């Protein structure tokens, strides 16, 4: 519900961050149930902020929301080189890859990762997001999905597992 309110601009980043912190605390309690199988894991989502960008608030927010949606999240951190994303694709077969950026100067890193993904594993889903990212950019570089907010990312992930 919070994600929907954020995407509809009913609440803003401070409220979203407070909600994400509360979710993070609840995930600490729920994590053992995911591990022992009492709560079904929907899949693995690998996320990182691309090379040249040290910003992580958006990435962390998306990670918490997606984890709260029942996905296992592998966070590669910030300033992540293309080869680390590609290694993660091999290490986590079937995972969905999430690329985050806040700086326009790092969009070229996103494009490089998507291009390399096509050469190695064209079926692997790559999502992109961040302040400078648009649907036009997503289409231009051939990424599979763009969302301006975490709510859209979770909805997309839930759709692809139904296919």
Model regions and ranges:
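Domain-level signal for soluble alpha/beta catalytic cores
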Residues: 1-163
């Amino acid at each position: 519900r919070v994600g929907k309110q954020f995407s509809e601009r009913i609440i803003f980043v401070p409220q979203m961050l407070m909600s994400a912190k509360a979710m993070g605390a609840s995930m600490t309690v729920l994590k053992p149930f995911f591990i022992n199988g009492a709560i079904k894991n929907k899949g693995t989502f690998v996320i990182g902020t691309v090379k040249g960008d040290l910003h992580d608030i958006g990435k962390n927010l998306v990670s918490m929301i997606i984890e709260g949606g029942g996905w296992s999240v592998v966070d590669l951190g910030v300033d992540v080189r293309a080869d680390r994303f590609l290694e993660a694709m091999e290490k986590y077969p079937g995972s969905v890859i999430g690329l985050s950026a806040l700086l326009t100067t790092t969009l070229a890193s996103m494009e490089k990762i998507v291009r390399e993904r096509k050469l190695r594993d064209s079926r692997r889903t790559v999502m992109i997001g961040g302040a400078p990212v648009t649907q036009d950019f997503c289409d231009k570089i051939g990424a599979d999905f763009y969302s301006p907010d975490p709510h859209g990312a979770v909805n997309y992930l839930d759709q692809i597992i139904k296919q």
